């Protein structure tokens, strides 16, 4: 083993940079993690719900007293009647206040939890490795963020409020009914038990259909996003008919599953709503007979009817709340699959010391016997890769498509979860560096540039928190170095011109050059260029290469923009000024040396040199 050793760290050293929900397979524990952060608001809301229901069951008692008072027909009871009426009016006004308060103290935390889960989801998605996105389409992820989190918000807001409301109402109201007439209360409970036995069976079917619909919605969202992203390809290949048929198929599947949910609800909900009418008929029939037999007063019967009416909303709401909880819990399970994803160990490290720039200045970057196999692969795509990049060097990597160039770049950037002991920055194992330090030291321009729907200026200065302090003259120099100054000057609003979604208003070469200008804006230790010149002509390529090589030299009292450069390409013309060139084939270094040596040695490099020279001539 070389002197470059990985620094041993205990498991306790691996702490999250950002506080995330605890890892658990129990979705109720995860839900509780968010709810308990708003315990004070929920506690006040629960008290408000209790007060609301206490007032609701108190008013019928005064109605009973008032009716019985009227039934007695005594003139002396007029003052007492007015007292009862004023009490009922006061209770009604108080109930309006506490009921409104209960909604505020439940709904506000629900919205806050929705926001927090979205933030946690986004943080987690930003930290996950590239292979996660290869398995999960963006449309699927968008569906989880939009639809599934909405279901969780409904649980934490309206759902919890109604759960406490229903529990309290179904406790207080039957108690008051029992006080009036135990026998009549038992008659009312029997149909309730029968109805809810049937409803419970319907809810099981409802949950299964909701889970299936959510999966169907994710597939539909994924296909829609993919189709819109590839709209130019679909139009150019006359694939609109195929795309439309595929969308209709997914949409019909979504409709079929939604109809199953509607059918189940149409069976469950009417049973709950018709229960109210059945209870009223039952109370009038049996209670009326009790009044005739003088076992019950008219006031008591009126109060009992009022109590049975108070049972109506909780009983109907129980079906809605059960549906809401089932749908929300299905969404929470989907969210949990993202939040519980394992992070690479390096992403859990605190910031490393010493800083990366010092590490690179000492010994550069070294790759030692690097092997890599994709998680679902059956063979290594990189095998026994060894090389070193010293400060001030230009290293070239050349190879045909599928030779492992991009995988190597992703490994150097740690977009892939590499094994410790394979890549070192100075004396430090790259696998144990924090992302913050690594991205400061190593900057990459990819072969597939991504531009935001923003201005040219904001795309170049993306993620640069110190942009306001950048000299405008330096910004223009960067545009010139990226061969963009003349073209940007012709844009309608110069650098303030909007580039459209994913840079749709620009050519492929312009996109790559904006991405290159973004990397040139601030100094770094190692600048990696992954096939960034593939969409430009040879004349522009020569200009860009000259400007790229200038990044290694201090200029106008400014430090060098990069200490070393790694150029990855399939063009031999990009390798002419490199200090050392690696030739990759099938994941292995099959040849290496200087440009002047490789063009004289039989092999892939010489073949590509002759082929590209003939093409250019």
Model-derived regions: residue spans:
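Membrane-integrated ABC transporters
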Residues: 1-56, 71-87, 102-106, 110, ...
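Juxtamembrane loop-to-helix connectors within ABC transporter transmembrane domains
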Residues: 17, 23, 106-110, 126-171, ...
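Transmembrane helices of ABC transporter permease
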Residues: 37, 41-54, 58, 91, ...
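Alpha-helical segments in transporter systems
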Residues: 40-65, 84, 88, 103-107, ...
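Hydrophobic alpha-helical segments in the permease module
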Residues: 87-99, 192-196, 200, 265-279, ...
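An intracellular "coupling" helix at the cytosolic face of ABC transporter transmembrane type-1 domains
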Residues: 130-131, 147-156, 160, 164, ...
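Cytosolic ends of transmembrane helices, especially the final helix of ABC transmembrane type-1 domains
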Residues: 216, 239, 263, 311-340
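ABC-type nucleotide-binding domain
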Residues: 356-617
